Structure formats: structure tokens, C-alpha cells
């Protein structure tokens, strides 16, 4: 069974389709792996073993009936616990939703089921996707499989840890300020933020509606592309959904060629203040692009220096509005409802006990930024910076086909190291936030281990809106070249590799 864990998602899907193995065998192999190691990693909040095997049997029955299966039919997937699932709990890693089960599936969930993927369960995250370390979960932190004393990044840390520990070949995540790319980078994985509006938010528990983007986490670029295509596309139930063809990311991942491509190195997203080992691996990756026939150009995006400040006004402002729905009246936790208290008192008690410290911090910050007398000075100014960032991206993409930077300024930090220092925590998303504010596409691919701590470093590849395929094409090219250089995948060096 261990041999099945070593297969890529594409290879596993092909093996199931050909009858070389079965969906049940693949699912059981991953369920056994979860039982073996998740006590140490804590990637999952809920494992749906019986339901997963039931889904797997249905895929095998379809094949036995002669039906042609899709490329990921029967392949297990771990699902971030912010996507609603009608047959298992959805908590957003918050006490306020403990035990709650949605009456409907999110579009991402629905499309994965339709594509025949087997949902193993729901993964841990920072509460309501607010955080960069998965330490803000009400159900305890997830640990990085490369070093269990370190964080797996966040907020999609459970999904990244599950894939890195070979508890799942694929996982879903959400990216609001870097919450897919950052954990993928520090866990030695591939993670993508699709163009905003190309992957549906219907059934996604909202953090910041103008920023939240579902995306894939995988062990290689092709696997990420296959998952990306499986759940993307227009959805009339999401008012922000883009009615455009899904960028051909699978085709681009298979092309894996950067000859003649213009690669723009963003001046403002590297250099001073970055961990030396991160900069070393990033510089080597840029040189590798050049050796593969790409043209390297330096680009400047001055507004990016204000991106972090703008994001931490815009995102909390939207969160303060979105989380108002958790009012102790309709669903979720209800505290103090003994008949002696008013509805307002019950609501206040419920929120006080149901929301964690980081969520409360962001609600307060957002409410202040939107308050009378401060709206223009804070939220209004942040939106103006957002416009400048979009313009800087547009200008940069006149000079380059894709832009690159490190994915994170440092490798994974130690558990507890930044939990009491919000500003230090927020800096983990320094390189990824501009892409969310602009809405364009980005991909993180592993580019080596930092010499100081032997922890993974991510290469961040940014592409224009609806040109996700460019990022995948460049990412696949550098991935193939590095695989040749290393003599295999970087993940084979992980402490939890099989």
C-alpha cells in the first residue's frame, strides 16, 4: 500500500482508470497513513473514513460498468474546513461553529465530487482563515512535517501538512493574502492562487469577500493544475464569478517551457530583511530560468511597499462585516441562553467565548477602520493603494510575461515564536499580498532548502489576470530542471516522506 502513496495524483488517477489499482485500495492506503501519522501532525479536524470508502466504491463501480473515468476520479483529496460539506462537519476551526453541519455543499466540494475525487476529510486552519501559521485554530496547531517544532504556514496549514506528510495526494485551500502559497512554500509543495473569480466562493465561509480565492495544493505542478481545472469555472451562484474560459493550466504544466519568456524580478519583493538562505535559493532559481532560455528583467512596483498596510485595513474591514452573521441566533454556538438574558447579551457572550483572539483583533480593527470619521482616512486610503497596486502590476506585465519573488521572506518559524507578535506574523505574507489585492494569478513552487535550517523555500511566480497558464508553464519548467538537478523531488527529503 505504501507504493500507492508515492504515486503523483496524475499517476494514481491513471492507475485507477486502467484498473492497475482501485479507488478503494488508494483510499484505504491514505486512511491508514492518516491513522499512522496524524496524531503527530494534526492536519485533519475530521476524517470521514466510511464516507470516503463509499465514494471510492462508487468510482470503482463506474469503472467496472465500462465508464471512462476522468484524470482524478478515485484520487483522494483533503478539504480545507472552510468549504461546506453536507455530509460532514464544517467548523472553520472555530468554537463558534463546533459541530455544525451544512445542509449543502460548496461549489468546490460539489465539483470535486462530480469529478470523482474522494474526500478524505476536513483539514485544520487558522480560525476563519485568519493567520499565517495554523496556530490560531480553536482545535490546536498543526505541525510542519519537515520539522514538527515548526509551523506549516497558514491559513491552509492543515492542507499543506497533509500533503507533505503523505496523508493526501491533493488538498484544497483558500488564499486571501497568501494562505495557499505561503504554507505550500514552507512545506515544500506547489500551491496556486487562481485569478480572482475563476474559482467559485459559493459555500466558502467568507473572510474577506473581495480577496478570498479557492485554490489547489499538491506535490507537483501538474497535479496542482489538474485539481485547479477540476473545480474552476463560472458559477452563477457566486456574484463575483468570472464568465470566462478556465485558463489552460494542465496544458501549460505539460508544456513546461520558458524559452523566450520574459521573467520580471520585482525589486520591492526581495533583498534586505529577507533570510539569506531564502535569497540564495531565489537567486539560483532566477539564474536557472535564464539558463533555460528565459530573458530576465528587473521591474519596479513602488506601491507594493504599502500592500501589507492596505491589506490589513481592507481584509479586517470585510471580515468585520462577514462575521456579523455569527449572532448565536440561527446556527452554531449559543452561550447563556437560559431565559434570563436578552438576545444582545446572549450574542455578546457567544462571541466572547466563540471567537479566538486573532479573529477578535481583526473584527475590532475592521470595525474601527469603517467607523464614522475614520472611513476615508483608513479604508478609503487603503482602497486607493489597491488601485495603485493594480496599475503597477499592469505596467510590470508590459515588461515581463511573469513576475517572480520569494514566496516568503523566511522559512517556517518555530511554533509559538510569533504568536504574541501580530506584526511579525503578518510579515509572512509580505510577498503574496499584492497579488490578492490585484486579483491576478500566482503559483508557488519549491526551489530548494535554505542552508541555515534545511527547510523548504518557495519561488513565487505571478501572472496577469486570466493568464494562470503562464505561471504554471514557468513553474513546471523550473520544477523539471530542479528535479534533474536534485535527482528527484525535494519532498523525498522530508522527515515524513514515504
Swiss-Prot record:
The gene is gatA. The keyword Repressor does not apply. The lineage of its organism: Bacteria, Bacillati, Actinomycetota, Actinomycetes, Streptosporangiales. The keyword Nucleotide-binding applies. Heterotrimer of A, B and C subunits. Belongs to the amidase family. GatA subfamily. Its EC number is 6.3.5.7. PANTHER family: GLUTAMYL-TRNA(GLN) AMIDOTRANSFERASE SUBUNIT A, TRANSAMIDASE. PROSITE patterns: AMIDASES. It comes from Thermobifida fusca (strain YX). Allows the formation of correctly charged Gln-tRNA(Gln) through the transamidation of misacylated Glu-tRNA(Gln) in organisms which lack glutaminyl-tRNA synthetase. The reaction takes place in the presence of glutamine and ATP through an activated gamma-phospho-Glu-tRNA(Gln). It catalyses: L-glutamyl-tRNA(Gln) + L-glutamine + ATP + H2O = L-glutaminyl-tRNA(Gln) + L-glutamate + ADP + phosphate + H(+). GO terms for molecular function: ATP binding; glutaminyl-tRNA synthase (glutamine-hydrolyzing) activity. InterPro entries: Amidase, Amidase_CS, Amidase_dom, AS_sf, GatA. GO terms for biological process: translation. One of its GO terms (cellular component) is glutamyl-tRNA(Gln) amidotransferase complex. The active site is at residues 80, 155, 179. Pfam families: Amidase (PF01425). Residues 132-159 are annotated as: Disordered. Keywords: ATP-binding, Ligase, Nucleotide-binding, Protein biosynthesis. This is Glutamyl-tRNA(Gln) amidotransferase subunit A.
Amino acid at each position: 500500500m505504501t507504493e500507492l502513496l508515492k504515486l503523483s495524483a496524475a499517476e494514481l488517477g491513471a492507475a485507477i482508470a486502467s484498473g492497475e489499482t482501485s479507488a478503494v485500495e488508494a483510499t484505504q492506503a491514505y486512511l491508514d497513513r492518516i491513522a499512522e501519522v496524524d496524531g503527530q501532525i494534526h492536519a485533519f479536524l475530521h476524517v470521514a473514513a466510511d464516507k470516503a470508502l463509499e465514494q471510492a466504491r462508487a468510482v470503482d463501480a463506474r469503472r467496472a460498468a465500462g465508464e471512462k473515468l476522468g484524470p482524478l476520479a478515485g484520487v483522494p483529496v483533503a478539504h480545507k474546513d472552510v468549504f461546506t460539506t453536507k455530509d460532514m462537519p464544517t467548523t472553520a476551526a472555530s468554537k463558534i461553529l463546533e459541530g455544525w453541519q451544512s445542509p449543502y455543499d460548496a461549489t468546490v466540494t460539489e465539483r470535486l465530487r462530480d469529478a470523482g475525487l474522494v474526500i478524505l476529510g476536513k483539514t485544520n486552519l487558522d480560525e476563519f482563515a485568519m493567520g499565517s501559521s495554523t496556530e490560531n485554530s480553536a482545535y490546536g496547531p498543526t505541525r510542519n512535517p519537515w520539522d514538527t517544532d515548526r509551523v506549516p504556514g497558514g491559513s491552509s496549514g492543515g492542507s499543506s501538512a497533509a500533503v507533505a506528510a503523505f496523508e493526501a495526494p491533493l488538498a484544497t485551500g483558500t488564499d486571501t493574502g497568501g494562505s495557499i502559497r505561503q504554507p505550500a512554500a514552507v512545506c515544500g509543495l506547489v500551491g496556486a492562487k487562481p485569478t480572482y473569480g475563476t474559482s467559485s466562493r459559493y459555500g466558502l465561509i467568507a473572510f474577506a469577500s473581495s480577496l478570498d480565492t479557492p485554490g489547489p495544493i499538491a506535490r507537483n505542478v501538474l497535479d496542482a493544475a489538474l485539481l485547479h481545472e477540476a473545480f474552476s469555472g463560472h458559477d452563477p451562484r457566486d456574484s463575483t464569478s468570472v464568465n470566462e474560459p478556465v485558463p489552460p493550466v494542465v496544458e501549460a504544466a505539460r508544456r513546461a517551457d520558458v524559452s523566450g519568456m520574459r521573467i520580471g524580478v520585482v525589486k520591492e519583493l526581495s533583498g534586505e530583511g529577507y533570510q539569506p538562505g531564502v535569497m540564495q535559493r531565489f537567486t539560483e532559481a532566477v539564474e536557472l530560468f535564464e539558463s533555460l532560455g528565459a530573458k530576465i528583467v528587473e521591474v519596479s512596483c513602488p506601491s507594493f511597499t504599502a500592500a501589507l498596510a492596505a491589506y490589513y485595513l481592507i481584509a479586517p474591514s470585510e471580515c468585520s462585516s462577514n462575521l456579523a452573521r455569527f449572532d448565536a441566533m440561527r446556527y452554531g454556538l449559543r452561550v447563556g441562553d437560559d431565559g434570563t438574558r436578552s438576545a444582545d447579551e446572549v450574542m455578546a457572550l457567544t462571541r466572547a467565548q466563540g471567537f479566538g483572539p486573532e479573529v477578535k483583533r481583526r473584527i475590532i480593527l475592521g470595525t474601527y477602520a469603517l467607523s464614522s470619521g475614520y472611513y476615508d482616512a483608513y479604508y478609503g486610503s487603503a482602497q486607493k493603494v489597491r488601485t495603485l497596486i493594480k496599475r503597477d502590476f499592469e505596467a510590470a506585465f508590459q515588461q515581463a510575461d511573469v513576475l517572480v519573488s520569494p514566496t516568503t521572506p523566511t522559512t517556517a518559524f518555530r511554533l509559538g515564536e510569533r504568536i504574541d507578535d501580530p506584526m511579525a506574523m503578518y510579515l509572512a505574507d509580505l510577498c503574496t499580498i499584492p497579488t490578492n489585492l490585484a486579483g491576478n494569478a500566482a503559483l508557488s513552487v519549491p526551489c530548494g532548502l535554505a542552508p541555515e535550517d534545511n527547510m523548504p523555500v518557495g519561488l513565487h511566480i505571478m501572472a496577469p489576470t486570466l493568464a494562470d497558464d503562464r505561471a504554471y508553464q514557468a513553474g513546471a519548467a523550473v520544477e523539471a530542471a530542479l528535479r534533474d538537478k536534485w535527482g528527484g523531488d525535494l519532498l523525498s527529503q522530508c522527515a515524513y516522506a514515504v
